[in-house]
Every structure is written in C-alpha cells, then in structure tokens.
Amino acid sequence: IPACMVEDGGCWDPLGEAFNSATQRAETLRNL
C-alpha cells in the first residue's frame, strides 16, 4: 500500500490525516 494514494481530491495521506485528526482533537479538548 503506497503511503500516498491518488484520489479525485488529489493526494490523500493516511498518516497525515490521522495526525491532523489527533491535533484537532487535542486543540478541541484544550479549548473546553
């Protein structure tokens, strides 16, 4: 499985998406 799979929206990076999700979740908890 390639680290970067090309989709209609361009390039999707599973690890990058997971990292962004974790970052956003941490920011949300911090803002509570």
From Swiss-Prot:
Tissue specificity statement from the Swiss-Prot or TrEMBL entry: Placental basal zone cells.
UniProt KW Iron keyword: no
GO MF annotations in UniProt: hormone activity
Keywords: Disulfide bond, Glycoprotein, Hormone, Secreted
Disulfide bonds: 4-11
Cellular location(s): Secreted
Modification comment: Glycosylated.
Gene Ontology CC terms, in alphabetical order: extracellular region
Family label: Belongs to the somatotropin/prolactin family.
Full protein name: Growth hormone-related protein 4
Organism: Rattus norvegicus
Species classification: Eukaryota, Metazoa, Chordata, Craniata, Vertebrata
